[in-house]
């Protein structure tokens, strides 16, 4: 590895599925690595055994692949700096825990959760910021040893705490936020680096892993800023170089103005949910990258390769990024328009199957008919599930005519136009869009009705809608039999209402 090689990582916890915020972290690290011809590493931080879910890791990796991300090292690929799961690195962490203890920079703490809670409550009552108070204050080494042995005899299990240097000031030049500074006293006292079950805490394990995996830059969310001084303290204690840090802005709900929270049910927040709705991965990438990063110029639609080429971490925003679902829908619609009919049909197929609009083993003719329906409406939809409402009328028959549509049928010429068109459809040996268009033009010529007064009654009679894609194509896909049935129904209604 060259001295200046860029190495970044995305390190998810398998405690849940891929969240929008975490997907953004993965994307920004990926873009930085690929733009700088560096390495992108996946590491699974699975030390929180109580919260890990069974398919958490698989789900994370599967959704990253769906987004088009590839990585150079990881739990599924291996690499020179593995293992890439923290649960498989416990012996490595234990080695460095012992090194810190041997240096007097870490120690065993036997305070119970109840004692710690009582300490916090007393501090709050005294209007102090809650912090850990050294439990061995004023004790000699022999007294400390005796106290620890007594705790062991009671069956208490210790945590290991890192001894924070009291007068230290932790400073770094953040790649996003600029100069940052924390005084040691603001950290909250000596913090835990190993839990009672022997597992390392996040702040300890991440330092060991990032150093041994030669991570050069750490891009992560703004909520990790307060972790940085703790991690810097461990780097310094072990005599290691600190990587460069960049903390990305918060994502807020544009409707509430509040930080996007996993508990906020008003917003879909997991990549899996957008996949299920039939969003395109390229659109999700595009939308997420624009949450806190801005390209030069007015254009907003770019492929992942284009983002890699133009990426500049200096254009990461310090201000919160607004999550706007309508903006996502607009971006996805742009990609729907750019995609081929086959690509959109592939994405829409699960939605059509779930809605019972087609069978998995449907004959080739019906498959092609459905593909053409999807092609007809692909410019109209924001995401694939919306195709269901557009296709349903062609399979199950149109919905009832709206009051708006009924008002359009009050024109005196409506019945004349529909009857004339019905006669021409009935006379067709083969009905396609070209023939339908010719028939409409023939009706215009014979009835002298044109424009909206010609097209609107025909659209409403066949589709029961006042707007939609090209009418000849729609009529072709309804087919001659259904089209005649719809026209006859409308003629009967209009004659009855005369």
Curated annotation (Swiss-Prot):
Keywords, in A-Z order: Aminoacyl-tRNA synthetase, ATP-binding, Cytoplasm, Ligase, Nucleotide-binding, Protein biosynthesis
Keyword Zinc-finger annotated: no
PROSITE patterns from the UniProt entry: AA_TRNA_LIGASE_I
Residues given in the record as ATP binding sites: 262
Domain of life: Bacteria
Protein name according to UniProt: Glutamate--tRNA ligase
InterPro entries registered for this protein in UniProt: aa-tRNA-synth_I_cd-bd, aa-tRNA-synth_I_codon-bd_sub2, aa-tRNA-synth_I_CS, aa_tRNA-synth_I_cd-bd_sf, Glu-tRNA-ligase_bac/mito, Glu/Gln-tRNA-synth, Glu/Gln-tRNA-synth_Ib_cat-dom, GluQ/Sye
Record's subcellular location: Cytoplasm
Gene: gltX
The organism's taxonomic lineage, starting at the top: Bacteria, Bacillati, Bacillota, Bacilli, Lactobacillales
Subunit structure: Monomer.
Known EC number: 6.1.1.17
GO molecular function: ATP binding; glutamate-tRNA ligase activity; tRNA binding; zinc ion binding
Record family assignment: Belongs to the class-I aminoacyl-tRNA synthetase family. Glutamate--tRNA ligase type 1 subfamily.
A GO CC term assigned to this protein in UniProt: cytosol
Reactions catalysed: tRNA(Glu) + L-glutamate + ATP = L-glutamyl-tRNA(Glu) + AMP + diphosphate
EC main group: ligase
Keyword presence, Ligase: yes
Gene Ontology biological-process entries: glutamyl-tRNA aminoacylation
Residue positions of motif 'KMSKS' region: 259-263
A Pfam family: Anticodon_2
Motif 'HIGH' region in this chain: 12-22
Role summary: Catalyzes the attachment of glutamate to tRNA(Glu) in a two-step reaction: glutamate is first activated by ATP to form Glu-AMP and then transferred to the acceptor end of tRNA(Glu).
């Amino acid at each position: 590895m060259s001295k200046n090689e860029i190495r970044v990582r995305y390190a998810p916890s398998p405690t849940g599925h891929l969240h929008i915020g975490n997907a953004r972290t993965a994307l920004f690290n990926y873009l930085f690595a690929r733009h700088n011809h560096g390495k992108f590493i996946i590491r699974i931080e699975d030390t929180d055994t109580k919260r890990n879910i069974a398919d958490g890791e698989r789900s994370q990796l599967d959704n990253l692949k769906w987004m088009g991300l590839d990585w150079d090292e990881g739990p599924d690929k291996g690499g020179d700096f593995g293992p890439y799961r923290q649960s498989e690195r416990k012996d490595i962490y234990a080695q460095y825990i012992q090194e810190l203890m041997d240096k007097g920079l870490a120690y065993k703490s036997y305070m119970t959760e109840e004692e710690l809670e009582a300490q916090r409550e007393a501090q709050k009552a005294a209007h102090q910021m809650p912090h850990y108070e050294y439990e061995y204050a004023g004790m000699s080494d022999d007294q400390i040893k005796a106290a620890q042995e007594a705790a062991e005899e009671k069956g208490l299990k210790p945590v290991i705490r890192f001894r924070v240097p009291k007068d230290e000031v932790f400073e770094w030049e953040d790649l996003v936020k600029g100069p940052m500074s924390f005084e040691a006293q603001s950290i909250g006292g000596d913090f835990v680096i190993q839990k009672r079950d022997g597992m390392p805490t996040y702040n300890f394990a991440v330092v060991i892993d990032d150093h041994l995996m030669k991570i050069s830059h750490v891009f992560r969310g703004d909520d990790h800023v307060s972790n940085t001084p703790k991690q810097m303290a461990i780097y310094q204690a072990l005599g290691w170089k600190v990587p460069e840090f960049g903390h990305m802005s918060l994502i807020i709900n544009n409707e509430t103005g509040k930080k996007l929270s996993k508990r906020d049910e008003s917003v879909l927040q997991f990549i899996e949910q957008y996949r299920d709705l039939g969003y395109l991965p390229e659109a999700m990438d595009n939308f997420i990258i624009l949450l806190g990063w801005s390209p030069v110029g007015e254009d907003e639609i770019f492929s992942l390769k284009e983002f890699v080429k133009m990426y500049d971490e200096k254009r990461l925003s310090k201000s919160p990024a607004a999550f706007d679902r309508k903006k996502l829908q607009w971006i996805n619609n742009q990609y729907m328009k750019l995609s081929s009919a086959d690509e959109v049909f592939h994405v829409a197929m699960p939605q059509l199957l779930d809605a019972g609009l087609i069978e998995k083993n449907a004959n080739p003719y019906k498959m092609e008919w459905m593909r053409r329906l999807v092609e007809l409406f692909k410019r109209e939809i924001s995401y694939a599930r919306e195709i269901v409402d557009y296709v349903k009328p062609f399979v199950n028959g149109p919905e009832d005519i709206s009051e708006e549509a009924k008002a359009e049928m009050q024109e005196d010429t409506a019945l004349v136009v529909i009857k004339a068109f019905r006669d021409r459809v009935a006379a067709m040996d083969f009905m396609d869009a070209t023939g339908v268009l010719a028939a409409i033009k023939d009706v215009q010529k014979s009835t002298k009705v044109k424009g909206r007064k010609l097209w609107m009654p025909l659209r409403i009679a066949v589709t029961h809608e006042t707007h939609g894609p090209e009418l000849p194509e729609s009529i072709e896909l309804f087919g001659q039999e259904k089209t005649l049935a719809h026209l006859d129904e409308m003629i009967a209604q209009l004659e009855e209402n005369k």
